[in-house]
């Protein structure tokens, strides 16, 4: 973790975080790289039986950032579920895109993942 602010209650596992703000109860899995990003965090931990059932219905992706995902210059709203090996890099430098049905939009070149969004494993933005 370098040049970053980490909120209370975060679960951070062997990942790299640089020049970012990580909000309350954020979960970041192994191998993830977070750069120049604002993670809003989560409203709750998914630990109850009801939460586990909901998790199974959502494709098994927990709230937070999945393994080996790479996120750069993005805003991740609360309770977002980002799968393993997701790349949010905006490599094509798209300035504007309305993809709310896919769980995100781009304004001014900044990718914003909307609240409660689900980005399946392997997604590339």
Swiss-Prot record:
It is an enzyme of class 2 (transferase). It is found in: Plastid, Chloroplast; Plastid, Amyloplast. Heterotetramer. It catalyses: alpha-D-glucose 1-phosphate + ATP + H(+) = ADP-alpha-D-glucose + diphosphate. Pathway: Glycan biosynthesis; starch biosynthesis. Belongs to the bacterial/plant glucose-1-phosphate adenylyltransferase family. It comes from the Eukaryota. The gene is GLG1. InterPro entries: ADP-Glc_PPase (IPR011831), Trimer_LpxA-like_sf (IPR011004). This protein plays a role in synthesis of starch. It catalyzes the synthesis of the activated glycosyl donor, ADP-glucose from Glc-1-P and ATP. GO terms for cellular component: amyloplast; chloroplast. GO terms for molecular function: ATP binding; glucose-1-phosphate adenylyltransferase activity. It holds the Pfam family LbH_GLGC. GO terms for biological process: glycogen biosynthetic process; starch biosynthetic process. This is Glucose-1-phosphate adenylyltransferase small subunit. Leaves. The keyword Transmembrane helix does not apply. The keyword Chloroplast applies. Activated by 3'phosphoglycerate, inhibited by orthophosphate. Allosteric regulation. Its EC number is 2.7.7.27. Keywords: Allosteric enzyme, Amyloplast, ATP-binding, Chloroplast, Nucleotide-binding, Nucleotidyltransferase, Plastid, Starch biosynthesis, Transferase.
């Amino acid at each position: 973790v370098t040049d970053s602010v980490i909120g209370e209650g975060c679960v951070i596992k062997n990942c790299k975080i640089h020049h970012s703000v990580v909000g309350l109860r954020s979960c970041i899995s192994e191998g993830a790289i977070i750069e120049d990003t604002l993670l809003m965090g989560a409203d709750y931990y998914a630990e109850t039986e009801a939460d586990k059932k909901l998790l199974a219905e959502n494709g098994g992706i927990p709230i937070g950032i999945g393994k080996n995902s790479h996120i750069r210059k993005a805003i991740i709203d609360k309770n977002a579920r980002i799968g393993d090996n997701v790349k949010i890099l905006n490599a094509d430098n798209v300035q504007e895109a309305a993809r709310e049905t896919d769980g995100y939009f781009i304004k001014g070149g900044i990718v914003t993942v909307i609240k409660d969004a689900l980005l399946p494993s392997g997604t590339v933005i």
